Amino acid sequence: MLEDLIKEFKEIFKYDGEVETFFSPGRVNLIGEHTDYNGGFVFPCALDFGTYAVVKKREDKVFRMYSKNFKNLGTIEFNLDNLVYNKKDNWANYPKGVVKTFLDENYKIDSGFDVLFYGNIPNGAGLSSSASIEVLTAVILKDLFKLDVDMVEMVKMCQVAENKFIGVNSGIMDQFAVGMGKKDHAILLDCNTLKFEYVPVKLKNMSIVIANTNKKRGLADSKYNERRSSCEEAVKVLNDNGINIKYLGELTVAEFDKVKHFITDEEQLKRATHAVSENERAKVAVEFLKKDDIAEFGRLMNQSHISLRDDYEVTGVELDSLVEAAWEEEGTVGSRMTGAGFGGCTVSIVENDHVENFIKNVGKKYKEKTGLRATFYIANIGDGARRYVK
């Protein structure tokens, strides 16, 4: 595949010399959903599919970007001296925002580059195609311009690019998982301190199955930002009543139960209840995983989905239909929505002997209920973003 991408790069950019190649994964979060911007714990892993780039540094200040995923948009061109968000640049605003953020942080980037991107992460699936291209761009910049910057710093800058340049208030989880991923491990990340731990994911006779609802959705215009402000309002209410916290993630369920009566707005209370309980669930689930108790880990995945459905209200009929069909299947250890919600994907742990039936039966029930056709992927846990050497 890489040879084909290099060949296509050379045709599009009329160039026949040496090129650089890079890869950046997608990610899936196993548990700990909508906790990242609440200063809590998440448990994502990088996937073995993602975004590839073929790159050639230029002598001038021009960037020319082409994506095989958006061929109809052709080559998108912009200049180092004019890095502003432009709606018609569409997907290229993501890499552009990363370049701008590096410059704002005083990293020396003195020329542009030509790049061909190709991603095999389904767009809008909630598997972080945007974080993947952001971190990929950061790795390209570091390599081409020999920048002295570590991955955690790059991850933070990519989050800034998404928040400030694109205008989506995402937490740090996506970029962190994409940049810091490690084969066969998930990352227990404290989003408040960025302390993290690699935890081996040893599923023995089971697999991680990702199911895509194939429902069209956009993160920026979804109700994501509303959920976030609900939680911030709840924190404000608690602070006004003498509970001194910056994030809901600082409270255990027991501590929250003692003070939740201060939150009189019913919707805020539900949102805060999810943030606190999900954070505790994530920590407990990882302890079970370390003890090889996959059954308990799966049970907590199920509870996570119920909380996201009832308290956080970010699931919707498509995700619920997929998860409920999964729960009915023999061999399902756990199943929940993953990512921001309102469409996107579910993640399930399924016994290998039952995977084939799982895909067939869940797909059939989902189509009967929603009229949509789900796409299924068996996920392998891969490494983070890097220069790609065959």
What are these regions (language model features)?
Residues 39-46, 227-228:
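Short Gly/aromatic-enriched secondary-structure transition segments
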Residues 342:
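Glycine-rich phosphate-binding loop
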Residues 32-34, 46-47:
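N-terminal cofactor/phosphate-binding cores enriched in small/glycine residues
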Residues 1-22, 28-32, 40-41, 79-80, ...:
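Gly/Ser-rich oxyanion-binding loop with an adjacent helix/lid
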Residues 1-27, 52-88, 185-334, 349-390:
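C-terminal nucleotide
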Residues 131-132, 345-349:
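FabD-like malonyl-/acyl-CoA
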